[in-house]
Amino acid sequence: MSDHTLTLANGLNLGYAEYGDPRGEVAFYFHGWPSSRIQGSLFDDMAKKHCMRLICPDRPGIGLSDFQPGRTLFDWPETLTQLANHVGADNYHVIGWSGGGPYVLITALKLPKRLLSASIICGAPPLKFLGDREMFWLYRVMIQLRHYLPTVLGAVLRLGGLIAKGSPQKVPLRWLMKLLGQEDRRILNLPGIYEVVRDAALGALDRGPRSVIADADIYLNEWGFEISQINFPIHFWHGKQDRNIAWSYTERLASLIPAATSVLSDIDGHYSLPVTHAEQIIVAALQKSPSTGDAGQQDGNTGIDGELLGAVLRRQSR
């Protein structure tokens, strides 16, 4: 990993890390919540193997990036444009995991002519899509704290950071791991995987909970656009054992976007899908999307090799 900082036109610093092949096709990776640029290291090996230059910015207030008061999703395309120009990328891929998903969507809406492909892994949907029964209980609690006891939410996030520093094999983290599905627990217990997820989350908390809460507010507020306004094809990936974000949201999002594809795994969860299938996700992205000029007439021809998609998630249940 190599860390860098860019001073934006508004005078704020934007931090980012680079992974993969420095001479490869440029892809921007948008991290989840709470997370940071460090999360992109999970894709480093496969990005190198397939000649992808993976650039992972910290969102404002996270990690190396300065806090930006009052920002919305609509601020992101301009930030990304300045970063892309800085690294010399006229055209590029975008990939977002979990909380990075909405940033892929706004990029596809506002910057389609610069995109080569757009991929969302276990992506967060608009809040209006979420029903109480479908929402992860921890998110429900945090939303209530944000509305009624914001200072308590800050304390909860600090406590979460302290707990995360422990071992997933020991209490209390071992208890919390039981909230996840079997495959997610297996993946997070592999050497080095939990440490990356943990360090990425702690990187988000480096400057205190204010920035993490402000980042969450983006998801809680109205996004300011309808999903159906997006004409650029999105490649969606989701695991049916995801207990953080239900796979049904991905199906709903995909149904609203012309020529979108959705690849679902019966046995994967929120963490196991991107870690286990990083290579397939990157290969599919590099095959690029079809022209958006007649995206509504693609009739399922998405530009992703059908044999690849058919084989991606054919693992046997353990």
Label every PLM stretch briefly.
Residues 91-133:
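Conserved hydrolase catalytic core segment
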Residues 12-64:
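Conserved HGGG/HGGXW glycine-rich cap/lid loop of the alpha/beta-hydrolase fold
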Residues 259-318:
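Catalytic active-site module of serine/aspartate enzymes centered on a nucleophile-bearing elbow/loop
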